[in-house]
Amino acid sequence: MTDPCTTPILGIDAHAHVFSKDLSLTSGRRYSPDYDATVQAYLAHLHEHGLSHGVLVQPSFLGTDNRFLFDALAQAPDRLRRLAVVDTDISRGALQRMAGLGIVGIRLNLIGRALPDFTAPEWKSLFKNVWTLGWHVELHREVADLPGLIRQLLPFGCKIVIDHFGRPASRL
């Protein structure tokens, strides 16, 4: 994507999901949708609220199968960007191809999983590639675990986004 902004930016929705309930869902998921969230409906939603652009985030129930969202990006490449979910062993070339399709970062959905060790070799390689591409890392984890994860991420120089406000307690 050589010209990321042919549409004037009036406002950006920084987190949305699009999907079809008929897609192949990942095993071990916490949620299974019983409805469709289409790109057309999302673009209409942006218009209704005076927003010109959006960032689509790979939903956890689709795992690392990013094909649906690549198709979604193709429907409005001048208005949409996307976060991919990837395996730690993904190649630099695969990430570069994703960048060409409008990917601007990776989402680490760590809810319900053991805390990763971001100093492990496979993570180091991934974060080096993310930094090289100028992408950001979106962390989806409970707020109590975020300081330790962020401390591990900072040396890589990647921009960090906290997903869902760090999932604070509902009483807040």
PLM regions: where:
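H/E-rich (His + Asp/Glu) clusters that bind or coordinate divalent metals
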Residues: 1-2, 171
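Mid-domain alpha/beta scaffold segments of enzyme catalytic cores
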Residues: 2-133, 144
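Catalytic pocket-lining loop regions of alpha/beta-barrel enzymes
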Residues: 119-172
